[in-house]
Amino acid sequence: MVAATDRTSMFPADVDAITRTAQRYFEGTSYLWGGVTPWGADCSGLVQSVFALHGIDLPRDAWQQARAGSDAGRDLLATRAGDLLFFSDRADGHVTHVAISLGSRRVVHLALGRGGYALERLDDASDEYVRKLEARFLFARAVL
């Protein structure tokens, strides 16, 4: 697990509070590569900022975040709320995207393909973007 920092965080470091922050604080955020604020962020910026608000330090980039915490498996059905989900659109499997699991195959993330903030149901077979995202899933990490 990733340790909370010794500075006072704005919010409690529990899964319900973290998933609420991810859904509410960043709702409407536009995609901005390298951004870390509700006025513009990318996928890993969202993850880093949300967890930082709760006193949990994570690295900046998705590929670095993929090394944080502990293995939570490769089965989307088994992921729990608060887990980080990692994806790749590269043949070599290098991590290129991260999302926060809300449980029950739901995620919150910032995606260029969605123009920014998005809540997704990864079992929505009618949505082409979701089908592609699900096919790109690599693994999950537990950081709580």
Language-model regions, residue ranges each:
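Aromatic- and glycine-rich peptidoglycan recognition patches
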Residues: 6-8, 36, 72, 96, ...
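Short acidic loop-to-beta-strand element that houses the catalytic metal-binding Asp/Glu
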Residues: 84, 99
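Boundary regions of SH3-family modules and the immediately adjacent low-complexity/disordered segments
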Residues: 1-24
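Short, surface-exposed secondary-structure boundary micro-motifs
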Residues: 87-90
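Loop/turn positions that initiate beta-strands
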Residues: 1, 82-83
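Short, Lys/Arg- and Gly-enriched loop/turn segments at beta-strand edges
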Residues: 1-2, 92-98
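Catalytic cysteine-centered active-site loop
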Residues: 30-81
